[in-house]
A protein has these predicted regions:
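FAD-binding subdomain of flavoenzyme oxidoreductases
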Residues: 89-93, 102-238
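N-terminal accessory segments
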Residues: 1-29, 53-61, 66, 274-292
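Short, acidic (Asp/Glu-rich) active-site segment that either coordinates a divalent metal cofactor
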Residues: 69-74, 81-84, 190-198, 266-270
Length: 361
C-alpha cells in the first residue's frame, strides 16, 4: 500500500474511533515490528467497521493482549493493532449448569471471581489469570489450570464469535473453531478477530488441593508418568523445580501439586498415596497443599512485574526428564513450572530466577 492509501485508510479508521485511535508507526511493548496505529473498540460494530476498512485496503489486523504471553504474535507490519481493554463484558447464564460468555478484553480472574460465588469455575484457565485476557489466551490455545482433565483451551470454548477480514461476523464451533485458533500464526496470517467466547464451566465448590515433595527429578518424573498412565481422575496436575519452589517460598526440592473434586476422593486418595510412596515422594499436609495451590498464579500476580526471561517449551512425557536437565544448561539459576495435559503433553515455563530478582525473595 502506498503512502496515499495509508493516509486514506487511517482517515477512515480515525472516523470510526476518534481519539481512541493512536497513529503510528507504533512499536508496542513485547511486540515485534511496527504497526500503523492502535485502536480501542467499545463494541462489535466498531470491530466490523474496522475489518471492512482493513479488507478494502488489504492491511492486517492483530489483537493486542495483556502482555502475559511469552510467544504471542508481534505487531503487524503496516497494519493495525487492536486493544480490547474496553470490551470486557462478562455474562453468566444457566440454571443447574452454568455457562459464561465473555468479550475478549475480560480478564480470566474476573470470570473466575464471578463464577465462584455460584460454586462453579472455568474448566480451564491460564496460570496468568490475574492479568491475561480471554482474547489473548485464546490466541495461544494454551494449557493451564485444569488441562489434566480438560485439555487445551480451544477444547473448552463452546463457541466463539469472530469478525473476519472484510467485516463479516460468524460464530465458530468445534473443528472450525480449532482451525481458526492457530498458535504461532503471524498477524498477516490471521483470518480475523475474536469478539466473544462462550466457555465451558465445571462444579468447583469442593475441590481438594494436594501436594507432594520429591528430592530427585527422576522420582518426580516417574510419579507424573504413573498418575497419567493410571488415569487418576485429577482436575489439575502441575510441578515446580527447586528454583521455582524457592521463588514461591514453598521450601526446597521438587514439588508436585494439583486438585481434584472431593467426590472423587475414593478413587484419588489411595492412588496418590501409592504413587508417591513408590516414587519416594512425601505427601504434604493439607495446610501446605493449600499454600502451594494459592501460589499457582506466581509469577503473574498483579503486584509483580511481568517476567522478562521466560522460555516456553512443549514436550511429550517421554522427554520430560531430558528437558528438565536441559534447563540447568541454559541458566545457573533456573526456575521451572510445568503443566501436565491429559494428552501427555507438558508445558514448561522456564525463568532465570536471578534475572527476575527471585533469588532475593
Amino acid at each position: 500500500m502506498n503512502d496515499a492509501l495509508h493516509g486514506e485508510a487511517l482517515e477512515a479508521i480515525e472516523g470510526i474511533f476518534g481519539d481512541r485511535m493512536k497513529r503510528g508507526p507504533v512499536g508496542e511493548e513485547d511486540t515485534r515490528g511496527e504497526a500503523l496505529a492502535v485502536v480501542s473498540p467499545v463494541n462489535v460494530r466498531e470491530v466490523e467497521l474496522l475489518a471492512e476498512v482493513a479488507g478494502r485496503y488489504s492491511f492486517p489486523l492483530a489483537a493486542l493482549g495483556a502482555g502475559t504471553s511469552f510467544d504471542a504474535p508481534g505487531a503487524p507490519g503496516k497494519g493495525i493493532l487492536v486493544r480490547f481493554d474496553l470490551m470486557r463484558d462478562v455474562r453468566i447464564r444457566g440454571g443447574e449448569e452454568l455457562w459464561v460468555r465473555a468479550e475478549p478484553g475480560a480478564p480470566w480472574l474476573e470470570l473466575e471471581n464471578n463464577l465462584s460465588p455460584h460454586g462453579w469455575s472455568l474448566a480451564v484457565y491460564p496460570t496468568s489469570a490475574p492479568r491475561a485476557t480471554v482474547g489473548g489466551w485464546l490466541a495461544t490455545d494454551g494449557l493451564g489450570v485444569g488441562s489434566f482433565e480438560y485439555g487445551r483451551l480451544s477444547e473448552n470454548v463452546l463457541s466463539a464469535d469472530v469478525v473476519l477480514m472484510g467485516g463479516e461476523q460468524r460464530t465458530l464451533r468445534g473443528e472450525e473453531l480449532r482451525s481458526f485458533v492457530r498458535p504461532g500464526d503471524t498477524a498477516e496470517d490471521a483470518a480475523g478477530l475474536v469478539v466473544g467466547a462462550t466457555l465451558r464451566t465445571r462444579r468447583a465448590d469442593a475441590d481438594v488441593p494436594f501436594a507432594a515433595a520429591f528430592d530427585e527429578p527422576e522420582d518426580l518424573v516417574g510419579a507424573i508418568a504413573s498418575l497419567h498412565e493410571a488415569g487418576v481422575p485429577l482436575w489439575h496436575l502441575a510441578f515446580l523445580d527447586p528454583g521455582m519452589v524457592r521463588a514461591r517460598g514453598l521450601g526446597d526440592g521438587y514439588l508436585l501439586f494439583g486438585a481434584y473434586p472431593e467426590e472423587r476422593s475414593p478413587l484419588v486418595e489411595g492412588a496418590l498415596q501409592e504413587t508417591f510412596e513408590s516414587h519416594r515422594g512425601r505427601l504434604l499436609p493439607a495446610a501446605e497443599s493449600y499454600r502451594a495451590w494459592g501460589e499457582r498464579f506466581f509469577p503473574m500476580a498483579p503486584s509483580l512485574p511481568t517476567p522478562t526471561s521466560a522460555q516456553r517449551t512443549l514436550v511429550p512425557m517421554t522427554e520430560l526428564a531430558e528437558a528438565l536437565l536441559a534447563t540447568r544448561d541454559r541458566s545457573t539459576d533456573p526456575a521451572v513450572q510445568g503443566t501436565v495435559a491429559r494428552s501427555g503433553e507438558i508445558l514448561l515455563l522456564t525463568f532465570d530466577a536471578q534475572e527476575e530478582g527471585w533469588t532475593r525473595r
